[in-house]
């Protein structure tokens, strides 16, 4: 296969959906030589914030001289963005070569009467093959969904698990209580490892503590009472945490302070594991971390922000950030959601702040909530709403309505933010 053929192949496989479970993934990797067994991992789960924490840690590790793999999903701007080494996307040739091998292994499985691997399983196997080929010193690995039964959880060579903030999401797959969801997220914890956790609601924290005790793991949790001296701006922030004074981050959004504190806890854990991370390397890594799509400013006059707040917990943080960064400002929204999310609560939290809201539909995704249906839901909270027939049209409408002193907030499903950013930038 060439690159285009490999992408078409994976797109075709993705139409069959995804399932939770590890047997098919284990069999696929066995046929590929179990590349994951030759790597070391930082495994990251959670509902919100896991991608940001991964970005902080991988940037710090790369800056300290460790060849660092990064596996994330979904991505905003390029398919190849999901697999990186030291910030560089996987090469098209490498992707095509490894997908060719994966497709052959999948065909062998089908001939043997075994279930065919899902697209996410194939992509995860692709990442493992590539990271092995690149001889990565460490891989920062983001869970796709949940943790316990996620395809990434076939790994056995983790040096540390990180659990970001847990809240109610994917309840159809992970469970209808916070404890059940936390059990899935904590399912990545391996025996005798270091575990670092965000501050959690009591119900979730109890599950994590019990899991760590059962598996003889040391647990470090963020103490938010030790966060101080927070100074926010749309271009970045500074804060202090425990013995770390005046740490600068380039990521905006009030929630990024909490994510950065979790990353600093991760740094301390890595130091316990003899990773050589100097204070200067940590500070530079925190300051230089880029994580597009999380309260990211795309332009000024008017200010345009894109943010992947797609569930109630994230919407609550977005609301807090909007009130903090834009007090008294006129806000216009471009909003797109998946129908399997609790979009009604997202609307309740965010819609009252907006002068006008334009709803859009994420193109080419069967989970997308139709723009007209989303507009009808918004109208129950804020009657100043319309729906657009495309993401580009929605962005154009918002920019036409907003004055230079106003702000346009494009948020919701991560899957449409890349297209929205292209529309803002005139691509």
Language-model region placement:
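Active-site-proximal loop/hinge segments that shape catalytic or ion-binding/gating pockets
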Residues: 413
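Extended acidic/charged loop-beta regions that coordinate divalent cations
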Residues: 123-173, 205-245
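Beta-strand->loop->alpha-helix junctions that form or flank phosphate-binding loops
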Residues: 72, 198-199, 211-233, 250-254, ...
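ATP-dependent carboxylate-amine ligase catalytic core
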Residues: 27-29, 34-37, 63-156, 172
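C-terminal helical cap/extension that packs against the catalytic core
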Residues: 201-220, 235, 303-306, 312, ...
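Membrane-proximal helix-turn-helix segments that form the acceptor-binding/catalytic region
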Residues: 182-190
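Short functional linear segments
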Residues: 1-46, 53-66, 70-71, 107-115
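Nucleotide phosphate-binding/pyrophosphate-handling subdomain across enzymes
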Residues: 38, 133, 138-143, 149-162, ...
